[in-house]
């Protein structure tokens, strides 16, 4: 089972329950929180709209939650949209013209904004102006509308795909990193308390260890552990319950799922450990190159199982060891 699959409605509702609603609830990312709170407090003291903010990092690290906390600290309403939802200029115009003074506009998946939409955003972000072309042909004219002071908060998993002009218009950019294990354990403990679960310290550690250092994944595993505990009539979530659940999910002790192991095995067995290019690897896996680069690789690289070199991807000695495959002495990585 892929624990990153699209969530059913019930899980989405539970996710809303587990989402931190205050800075104290938001565990981890301490440097980001410290700098962000200073920016927000200064804007409030000046009674000005906050600078536009960009959050980037892997999925599930808390970018959306930060956007909500920004709006809460500013005492502002938050309007939510996404890059794919803003296909036409009229889509963006409808969003911008419905903003009120001080609103926070959150655009998720900002890297999927098309260039024409970005160009409309430039004057909106810089000068609070919305420039619209009215009419067609020789009768066409430019209409300029004033916008109220607002704060744009954008989130992306691929900051490199944002154009330079768009990136430069954010007053502050924050990279969210993978979480430290103690922070993930604290998040699991908090979520278990909110879900009214009786869970042992050993089970908390197991869920955290399999979470890929990502709060969203940790919470999703915890919900599946809860399901198994209820169905098996377990009195509490202990090490045995957590172990059985992870086995059923095919998630190992490092948080690797079947597709992660298959990627490493393919590099080792088909390409002698690498190096192998992304396009060739995608073809061998019958998978999308974007999935490899955006979903699988970052975590595998962060835990030292995969190396990305100018010549291509290589499985490290640690990958051989984790998969129980002898590491060839002649191949040094």
What is the role of each PLM region?
Residues 267-333:
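Terminal-proximal interaction/regulatory segments of ATP-powered molecular machines
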Residues 70, 89, 103-133, 159-169:
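Conserved AAA+/SF3 P-loop NTPase catalytic/coupling segment centered on the Walker-B
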């Amino acid at each position: 089972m892929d624990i990153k699959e699209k969530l059913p409605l019930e899980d989405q509702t539970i996710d809303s329950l587990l989402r931190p609603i205050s800075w104290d609830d938001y565990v981890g990312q301490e440097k980001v929180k410290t700098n962000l709170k200073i920016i927000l407090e200064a804007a409030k003291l000046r009674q000005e709209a906050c600078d536009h903010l960009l959050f980037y990092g892997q999925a599930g690290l808390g970018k959306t939650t930060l956007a909500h906390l920004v709006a809460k600290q500013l005492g502002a309403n938050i309007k939510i949209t996404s890059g794919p939802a803003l296909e036409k200029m009229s889509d963006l115009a409808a969003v911008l013209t419905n903003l009120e003074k001080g609103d926070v506009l959150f655009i998720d998946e900002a890297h999927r904004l098309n260039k024409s939409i970005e160009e409309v955003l430039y004057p909106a972000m810089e000068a609070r102006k919305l420039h619209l072309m009215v009419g067609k042909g020789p009768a066409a004219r430019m209409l300029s509308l004033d916008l109220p002071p607002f704060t744009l908060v954008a989130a992306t998993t691929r900051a490199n795909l944002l154009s330079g002009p768009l990136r430069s218009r954010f007053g502050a950019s924050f990279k969210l990193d993978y979480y430290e294990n103690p922070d993930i354990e604290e998040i699991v403990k908090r979520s278990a308390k909110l879900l009214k679960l009786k869970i042992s310290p050993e089970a908390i550690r197991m869920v955290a260890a399999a979470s890929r250092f990502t709060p969203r994944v940790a919470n999703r595993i915890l919900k599946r552990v809860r399901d198994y505990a209820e169905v098996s009539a377990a009195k509490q979530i202990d090490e045995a319950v957590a172990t059985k659940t992870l086995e059923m999910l095919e998630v190992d002790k490092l948080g690797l799922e079947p597709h992660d192991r298959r990627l490493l095995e393919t590099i080792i067995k088909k390409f002698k450990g690498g190096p192998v290019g992304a396009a060739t690897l995608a073809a061998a896996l019958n998978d999308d190159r974007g999935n490899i680069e955006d979903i699988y690789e970052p975590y595998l690289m962060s835990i030292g199982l995969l190396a990305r070199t100018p010549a291509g991807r290589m499985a490290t000695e640690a990958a051989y060891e984790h998969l129980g495959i002898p590491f060839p002495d002649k191949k040094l990585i």
